[in-house]
Curated annotation (Swiss-Prot):
<feature type="signal peptide">
    <location>
        <begin position="1"/>
        <end position="17"/>
    </location>
</feature>
<feature type="propeptide">
    <location>
        <begin position="18"/>
        <end position="87"/>
    </location>
</feature>
<dbReference type="Pfam" id="PF04389">
    <property type="entry name" value="Peptidase_M28"/>
</dbReference>
<protein>
    <recommendedName>
        <fullName>Leucine aminopeptidase 1</fullName>
        <ecNumber>3.4.11.-</ecNumber>
    </recommendedName>
</protein>
<keyword id="KW-1015">Disulfide bond</keyword>
<feature type="binding site">
    <location>
        <position position="355"/>
    </location>
    <ligand>
        <name>Zn(2+) 2</name>
    </ligand>
</feature>
<keyword id="KW-0964">Secreted</keyword>
<feature type="glycosylation site" description="N-linked (GlcNAc...) asparagine">
    <location>
        <position position="144"/>
    </location>
</feature>
<comment type="subunit">
    <text>Monomer.</text>
</comment>
<dbReference type="GO" id="GO:0004177">
    <property type="term" value="F:aminopeptidase activity"/>
</dbReference>
<keyword id="KW-0865">Zymogen</keyword>
<keyword id="KW-0732">Signal</keyword>
<keyword id="KW-0031">Aminopeptidase</keyword>
<keyword id="KW-0862">Zinc</keyword>
<comment type="similarity">
    <text>Belongs to the peptidase M28 family. M28E subfamily.</text>
</comment>
<feature type="binding site">
    <location>
        <position position="246"/>
    </location>
    <ligand>
        <name>Zn(2+) 2</name>
    </ligand>
</feature>
<feature type="binding site">
    <location>
        <position position="273"/>
    </location>
    <ligand>
        <name>Zn(2+) 1</name>
    </ligand>
</feature>
Length: 401
């Protein structure tokens, strides 16, 4: 939908009615004071930036334009990008089938449906709203419950808020490994109605409630693994549930900006944004599949994910593109970390109900979400088990031959 006239521009005048009287003898002047709308610095493509009002941000989004809001994170990526770093290396073959396949049998649709019914019951999860704050609090408590049910706190597994100034906090769960090298899985918790974000309902069942419950189910099952939950695997694992993705990847930028400054060793980041809608694929006469994004991602990590899908999922993948800054993986990429993104289908056949009051559970397939949960579970376990130092040394040795 591409309306030519902005609804908010008609409803919300930008002029203040305040006047100031100045007196100099018999001389009186009345000066209308114009209230300047707050401006935000956005990046629409690499190096292409502009200053816009918040309403102009939503107008761009209504017209299908994605962007980083870099107002608070102008330096993101400058540290790591300035360093000479070897290309990321990932296993050419999978090795954890004996551990992973029993875990996949534990994944279930019922917990995902229960969680999504609750998550979509908030009027909106708009990141500046009280509902957005409440939904983040609920998510934190639910992740804490998941950890407690697995008795994983005793191994140092924990969850905490990553606080933001706008009210809705991001949520990060950590499963310690033998090293500080970290595998990240992400999804975004906020929803938005692009016509009146502060007022209209935004159930956000698919965008990105589906990604939230998919990753939450993967976490539940992974914590049943004594090897992973007990910290016996090579690498640390983090699950991220980002705030304010819809506002320009604000939450994920804040997190990866912090990680960059801390010189965190993030080996891989996988984003799960929209995992449940298949109807347009079926209507087009095409087979059910997952969409592997191939633009603005790490090529080696993306190839690795294809092997994971081939080995552990029951449906194939299709290659597809989503453009610049299309979801939170872009923040990891900009910070210099290898990232990838898998969506529910070919991008052109993805959910057309998003960002409206109609993004509802009734349009989604929990069987399809289960395929994303399988991929996520396998991705985490395989990479958590990978000795990256050994892999990188072997790769360097081969390149010197």
């Amino acid at each position: 939908m591409k309306p030519t006239t902005s609804i908010l521009a008609l409803l919300l005048p930008a002029i203040s009615a305040r006047f100031v009287q100045e007196t100099d003898g018999d001389h009186v002047q009345l000066h209308p004071e114009v209230a300047e709308a707050e401006k935000f610095h956005i990046e629409l493509a690499p190096g292409e930036t502009r200053w816009v009002t918040e309403e102009e941000k939503w107008e761009l989004r209504r017209n299908g334009q994605r962007f980083f809001d870099i107002t608070s994170t102008p330096e993101l990526g400058k540290t790591l990008r300035s360093q000479s770093r070897p290309a990321a290396v990932f296993p050419s073959k999978l090795s954890q089938q004996d551990a992973v396949k029993p875990l996949l049998k534990k994944l279930a649709k019922e917990p995902m449906q229960k969680h999504l019914e609750k998550f979509t019951s908030f009027h909106t999860r708009y990141y500046k709203s009280e509902y957005g704050r409440q939904s983040s609090q609920w998510l934190l408590s639910e992740v804490n419950k998941t950890i407690a049910d697995a008795d994983a706190h005793k191994h140092g597994v924990h969850v905490q808020h990553f606080e933001h100034s706008w009210g809705q906090n991001s949520v990060i769960a950590t499963i310690p490994g033998k090293s500080k090298s970290t595998i990240v899985v992400g999804a975004h918790q906020d929803s938005i109605n692009l016509f009146l974000p502060s007022i209209l309902a935004a159930p956000g069942a698919d965008d990105d409630g589906s990604g939230i419950v998919t990753t939450l189910e993967a976490l539940r099952v992974l914590l049943t693994s004594d090897e992973l939950a007990g910290g016996k695997l090579e690498n640390t694992v983090e699950f991220h549930w980002y705030s304010a993705e819809e506002g320009g990847l604000l939450g994920s930028q804040a997190i990866f900006s912090t990680y960059e400054k801390q010189k965190r060793d993030i080996k891989a980041m996988l984003q799960q944004d929209m995992t449940g809608f298949i109807q347009r694929t079926i209507d087009a006469g095409k087979p059910e599949s997952v969409g592997v994004i191939v633009d603005y991602v790490d090529p080696a990590l993306t190839e690795f994910i294809k092997t994971v899908i081939d080995e552990y999922c029951d449906i194939p993948y299709v290659e597809t593109e989503c453009g610049y800054a299309c979801s939170d993986h872009a923040s990891a990429s900009k910070a210099g970390y290898p990232s990838a993104f898998v969506i529910e289908s070919s991008f052109d056949l993805s959910d057309n109900h998003i960002h409206t009051t109609d993004d509802k559970i009734k349009f989604l397939s929990f069987d399809h979400m289960l395929q994303h949960a399988k991929m996520t579970t396998a991705f985490v376990y395989e990479l958590a088990s990978t000795d990256f130092k050994k892999l990188e040394n072997e790769s360097q040795g081969m390149s010197e031959l």
